[in-house]
C-alpha cells in the first residue's frame, strides 16, 4: 500500500512546525535507503536559561532517507497513546472547519493524511486554540518517551538524544525545569510552544519556539534637552520621571492567558506616586503613538510596609487589556512593547534614608511573566537599574584669622538661583529648606557648635548664599556669594550620561571677597564650603576717656 509507505501528512506538518525543512514526498522504502538513527537535537534560545524537554510520540512509522527525501512507511498510532487520547484527537479534528474530509472511523494513516492536507501551511509558532495546540494538550497527558540510555524522560537542550522508535513526535518543555506559579524567583526561563517533528532517518535539529521577555528601565533628568537615561540627579521632593519598557515572549500567541507584572523596587529614600502610573502598549519598535491601557482597579499596588518599597503594575492576562479611550481590545503580539511611566521623588519626610553621592538612590525593576504556554508557570527577567543622585552642602563658618575658632549661631539663607530643574517662573525665587527641598518661603539655617550648616538633597545648579545681617555679632557680614554644582567634567563630558555608577562633580564658587570664601571641595557628593568672617575694626578716638567705638556690619556701637 503506497499510502502506508510514506507519511506525507505527518511529515509535512512536522517539518513545518519543527523547523526541519528537508523535502518530503511519498515514496517506496527501497533497499538503498539510509537506515534510521532516531536522533534529534533541540537547540535552546540563546537567552533562555537552563531548560529540559520531554518527548511524546503520536505516530510510529518506519522513517528512512532516500535521494534527499525523508521516506516513511507502516504508519500507526504510537503505543503510548491510549484509545481515549486517540479518540479525542479524532474528535478535535472533526470539530475543525475541514473535518468533513476525515472518514467516520479513520485510521492513523487517515489522520496523518488529513493533517498534511490541512495543517501544512500552519505557522511555526502554534497559536493558542489552534488544532495543533489542542492536540498538544491532549498528548501532554500521556506518558513521555525516555531517550535511549537515559534514566528519566527529561533531557537537556543542545545535546543529541535518540529514541527506540522512529515516527511523529511532540516535544514540550519539562515543567519541572522552569519556574512555577509559586516558585519563580531567579528562574529566567521560558517554555517552548509545541514542537512537532519527525524523528528517523538522518539526525534532526530544531530550535525551541520561545523568546525571553526583557525589561529596561530609564529615568529622565529635567535639565533641558535631557533624554531617558540610566542616571539623573534631583532635589529632595522633586518629582522625577521613570519609564519601564517590557517585551513579551516570542511565542505569546501560544498562550491562552498571559500573566505580566512589572515589579519595581525603590530604595528606602525614594517614594513613588502610584496615582501617576500610565501604561501604553506599542505595536512594535516603529510605533511611536501607542495605545494607552485601561488599567484594572487592582493593576497598580504600592507597598511601603516594613523595609519594602515596591511598586507593582500587573495584569493577570495581558492579552485581555483594553484601550483607555473606547475600551477596544488591544492586540498583543510577539512585537508588542509595554511601557509604564510614573513619577517618584526623594522623600522629604525620610531624608535620613536618602543617599548622597556614591552610587545614588537606586531603583530596579524586574518582569514576572507567564513562562510556559502548556502550564501555569511563571518566570522572572534579568533586572534593570537606574539611579537618582542628590548632593549635600557642608558650610563651615570660621574666624578669618584663627581657623580653629568656629562661629556658632550664624544664620544663612540659600536660594536656588539656577538649579537645573526649577519650574518655569521659580528660578531665583525659591529657597532651600532644612530637608533639602525647595519652597517659596525663606528658611534660615543656623551654624552649630562646629560652625557648620549641613543640608542634603541638593540638585545640580547654582545657589546663592546670603548671611543674615546681625546674626554674627562682632564680625563683618559676609557679602552674598554663589556656588555651582555641575556634573559636566572639565573635558566637557557629562557624568550623568556615562555608565560608571558614581558621578564626578565640578563645583565652583563666585565671590567678591576672594580671601573669605575658600575654593569648595567635593567628597562623595558632599560639597564643603569654608567661609571666613573678619572681626569689626577698633578705630582710634580722642576726647572720650575709656570709650572705644567699634564698627560692626556697617553700624556703630559704643563700648
Question: What residues fall within each predicted segment?
Answer:
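Solvent-exposed loop/turn and edge beta-strand elements of beta-rich ligand-binding domains
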Residues: 2-559
Amino acid at each position: 500500500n503506497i499510502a502506508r509507505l510514506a507519511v506525507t501528512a505527518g511529515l509535512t506538518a512536522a517539518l513545518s512546525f519543527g523547523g526541519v525543512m528537508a523535502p518530503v514526498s511519498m515514496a517506496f522504502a527501497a533497499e538503498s535507503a539510509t537506515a534510521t538513527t532516531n536522533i534529534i537535537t533541540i537547540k535552546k534560545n540563546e537567552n533562555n536559561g537552563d531548560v529540559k524537554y520531554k518527548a511524546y510520540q503520536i505516530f510510529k512509522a518506519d522513517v528512512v532517507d532516500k535521494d534527499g527525501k525523508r521516506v516513511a512507511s507502516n504508519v500507526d498510532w504510537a503505543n503510548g497513546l491510549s484509545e481515549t487520547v486517540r479518540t479525542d484527537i479524532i474528535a478535535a479534528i472533526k470539530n475543525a472547519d475541514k473535518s468533513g474530509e476525515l472518514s467516520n472511523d479513520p485510521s492513523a494513516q487517515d489522520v496523518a493524511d488529513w493533517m498534511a492536507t490541512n495543517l501544512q501551511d500552519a505557522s511555526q509558532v502554534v497559536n493558542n486554540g489552534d488544532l495543533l495546540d489542542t492536540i498538544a494538550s491532549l498528548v501532554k497527558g500521556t506518558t513521555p518517551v525516555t531517550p535511549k540510555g537515559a534514566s528519566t524522560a527529561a533531557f537537556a537542550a543542545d545535546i543529541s538524544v535518540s529514541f527506540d522508535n522512529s515516527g511523529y513526535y511532540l516535544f514540550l518543555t519539562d515543567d519541572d525545569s522552569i519556574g512555577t506559579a509559586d516558585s519563580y524567583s531567579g528562574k529566567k526561563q521560558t517554555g517552548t510552544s509545541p514542537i512537532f517533528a519527525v524523528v528517523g532517518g538522518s539526525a534532526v535539529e530544531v530550535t525551541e519556539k520561545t523568546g525571553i521577555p526583557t525589561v529596561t528601565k530609564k529615568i529622565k533628568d529635567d535639565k533641558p534637552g535631557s533624554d531617558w537615561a540610566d542616571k539623573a540627579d534631583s532635589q529632595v521632593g522633586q518629582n522625577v520621571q521613570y519609564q519601564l519598557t517590557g517585551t513579551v515572549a516570542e511565542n505569546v500567541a501560544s498562550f491562552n492567558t498571559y500573566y505580566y507584572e512589572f515589579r519595581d523596587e525603590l530604595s528606602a529614600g525614594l517614594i513613588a506616586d502610584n496615582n501617576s502610573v500610565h501604561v501604553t502598549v506599542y505595536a512594535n519598535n516603529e510605533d511611536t503613538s501607542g495605545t494607552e491601557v485601561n488599567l484594572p482597579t487592582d493593576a497598580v499596588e504600592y507597598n511601603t510596609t516594613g523595609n519594602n518599597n515596591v511598586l507593582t503594575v500587573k495584569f493577570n492576562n495581558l492579552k485581555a487589556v483594553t484601550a483607555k479611550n473606547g475600551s477596544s481590545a488591544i492586540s498583543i503580539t510577539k512585537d508588542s512593547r509595554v511601557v509604564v511611566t510614573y513619577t517618584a521623588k526623594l522623600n522629604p519626610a525620610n531624608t535620613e534614608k536618602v543617599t548622597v553621592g556614591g552610587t545614588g538612590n537606586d531603583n530596579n525593576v524586574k518582569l514576572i511573566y507567564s513562562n510556559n504556554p502548556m502550564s501555569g508557570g511563571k518566570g522572572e527577567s534579568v533586572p534593570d537599574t537606574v539611579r537618582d543622585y542628590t548632593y549635600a552642602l557642608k558650610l563651615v563658618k570660621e574666624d578669618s584669622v584663627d581657623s580653629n575658632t568656629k562661629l556658632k549661631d550664624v544664620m544663612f539663607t540659600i536660594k536656588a538661583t539656577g538649579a537645573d530643574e526649577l519650574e518655569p517662573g521659580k528660578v531665583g525665587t525659591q529657597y532651600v529648606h532644612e530637608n533639602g527641598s525647595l519652597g517659596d518661603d525663606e528658611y534660615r539655617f543656623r551654624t552649630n557648635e562646629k560652625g557648620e550648616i549641613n543640608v542634603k538633597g541638593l540638585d545640580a545648579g547654582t545657589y546663592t548664599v546670603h548671611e543674615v545681617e546681625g546674626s554674627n555679632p562682632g564680625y563683618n557680614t559676609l557679602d552674598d556669594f554663589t556656588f555651582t554644582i555641575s556634573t559636566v567634567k572639565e573635558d566637557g563630558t557629562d557624568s550623568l550620561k556615562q555608565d560608571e555608577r558614581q558621578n564626578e562633580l565640578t563645583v565652583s564658587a563666585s565671590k567678591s571677597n576672594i580671601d573669605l570664601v575658600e575654593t569648595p571641595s567635593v567628597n562623595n557628593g558632599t560639597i564643603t564650603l569654608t567661609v571666613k568672617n573678619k572681626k569689626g575694626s577698633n578705630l582710634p578716638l580722642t576726647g572720650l576717656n575709656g570709650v572705644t567705638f567699634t564698627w560692626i556690619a556697617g553700624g556703630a556701637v559704643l563700648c
